[in-house]
Amino acid sequence: MMKKPVILVPTDFTPVGDSAVAYATQLSKILDAKIELLHVVAKEKDAPMAKSALEAEIGRLEKRQIEASAHVEMGNIFDDIGKVADRQEARLIVMGTHGVKGMQHVMGSKALKVITNSDVPFIVVQKKPMKEAGFKTIIIPVDFNQEVKQSIKYAWEIGKYFDAKIHIVYVKEKDPFIAAKIEHNIPYAQELLEENGVAYSITGIDKKDFANEFIDLSAKLDADLITIINNHENIFTYFGGSFEQTIIGNKAEIPVLVINQIASKSAYSFSIYFG
């Protein structure tokens, strides 16, 4: 019997941590995956209470016919999530965040380091619950970077499970050289989606205040998932601040699938690991 793929869920037992568990629960049914709960403690004396809380959560999952296990890790959550993901051979990490303000306060600059240090894709969620129908509407910001093609491919692969419509949103760039590079990524998306019978749309947004306009459009479309590449060499970097951080902590509380550069350059594929 083949071993089920693992979804790793770091939890801190807060409402947003509970939201991550809820998302993972729904995804585990769709992807036929096992859930691995993780709680990291800095002091050994905190381990027994954490272990007890995790065992209670496992009991709730098992009542719902979800295969689950858990463990307590000594260390630092920012450094150890990637290590645990490797050890458990996790194929997806579902993690909660408290939004941009909370993320800056609680996690600071290390928030994206958690993702950057792992070759496993993350789905970062806030308190907003996952819809029963799942990720029916997926949105992707497109710039000139070649890794965006992998983001489009990931969106298509996960979207297959939900018969999703995919919305491509690109930057309207006045510089002809950059504009040509951005436009080069559009035909790839069209060909991939059309060949596989996926409904899609393509929309351009002015470069000025792209991040906030992108989030506003995502909310207007009632998006269920945003897909991005965690790449500091993209056009979005020049908009000021961290584009990735703004999207991850978006005010509409839309979940974000984040693929880092390590994964985007590897052979990782949802199709390979989740069928």
Q: What kind of feature is each model-predicted range?
A:
Residues 72-79, 205-211:
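Charged docking surfaces used in two-component/phosphorelay signaling
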Residues 55, 63:
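N-terminal beta1-alpha1-beta2 submodule of the flavodoxin-like/Rossmannoid cofactor-binding fold
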Residues 17, 74, 104, 148, ...:
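A conditional alpha-helix N-cap/helix-loop micro-motif detector
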Residues 67-70, 202-203:
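Rossmann-fold cofactor-recognition segment
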Residues 81-131, 219-273:
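Gly/Ser-rich helix-loop-strand patches that form or flank binding pockets
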Residues 48, 105-106, 135, 151-152, ...:
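Short, well-ordered secondary-structure micro-motifs
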Residues 1-49, 60, 137-181, 185-201, ...:
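Small/aliphatic-rich secondary-structure junction motif
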